[in-house]
Amino acid sequence: MTASKGYAAPETGQAYARARRLCEDLGDVTTLVRVGYGQYLYHLIRAEIGECHRVAEEILAFAEKTRSDEARILGCRTLGVSLFESGQLEAARVQLEVASGLLKEQRQRGAANRGDAGVTVPAWLAFVAAFQGYADQAARIRDLSVREANSTTSLHSRVFGLAFAAGTCCVLRQYDDLLARADAICALATELNFPFMLAWGMAFRGIAELHAGAGGGQAAWDGLALYRQTNSKWALPFWFGCYVSVQRHPSDETISMIQEGLDAIEATGERWFEAELYRLRGNFVRSLPRGGVKRAEQDFKTAKRIAASQGAKLLELRAATSLARLWSEHGRRKDARELLAPLYGWFREGFDITDLKEARTLLTALA
């Protein structure tokens, strides 16, 4: 049902609710973990972040009762993801690393994990690490997830692993092989008749083509339209932000899309891409003839503050670079250097990614 109707379809939610009532009547805690996971996905994809977190906590509580490592891995992973959704990056990573450690212990004992944890746990860890500013770690963990995805017999797990690897590439602005990744996602999702992941693949394809200057706008729009048809609201701010960030000729449609993303964040509490949307809005409004510079400065400051509060060092650096560039263009070179230098100095890896290169180039110009 999830593949054909979508994770967020009303029929899916109703089916899991019936299954949960039955498990509770029977006192079947083991099955409650699996049913709870279905409910968690239902709320996640609908961007019902509060409910998602509540169900994730229940899953972990059920898992502790079963004393099953597999269930505990699932519980820690779902709780980690729900924490990430609300912008609590470090707390999210702690839970995901517990899941990763349990998975490693399970493998050392020679026990096979019957779920998709070998793909999903490193996929999420890579995603979180990228936001936290650990680009090299993120790339290594991402590649591990892809290897696991390519070796699994579960095609649904495989397409998830490929999709999240593409997402991590977008966060790190590593677009070189994004088109090939998108094509692989589309092919596998089509084979599985899986509209949810086909939408991801189409959107990634459009983003890759836009970045390369080869059109792509329609492909991205078609992917987003298909995504909405599956009742999915999760990660819409991310998709809007990725689309806007590669546009070469922003328009009024650009600011409308950014605002829709910010409105969605306020409605859902899904805050992990909030800082980037404010930064992108700042980039757009800075060229407006009346009050553009002041509005841009405020948006860049807001983006930096949000990113700092979440521990999203990569987005904080990105916002600081935009703000420092604005200040330097208006005679505040000393302020710009003092803002950007300490933040750039925090980084110990990832010096080949676009964000660090841009920050380093600006600091050199400000020296």
Please report, for each region that a protein language model flagged, where it lies by residue:
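Non-membrane alpha-helical segments in proteins
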Residues: M1-K5, V33-I45, L74-E85, A123-A130, ...
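Flexible inter-repeat linkers and adjacent short helices
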Residues: M1-V29
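Short coil/turn and helix-start
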Residues: G6-P10, G50, Q108, A112, ...
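Helix-coil-helix junctions within alpha-helical repeat/solenoid scaffolds
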Residues: A15-C23, L60, C76, A91-L103, ...
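A conserved hydrophobic secondary-structure block that centers on an alpha-helix together
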Residues: H43-I49, T66
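Extended HEAT/HEAT-like alpha-solenoid repeat tracts in very large eukaryotic scaffold/adaptor proteins
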Residues: A117-V121
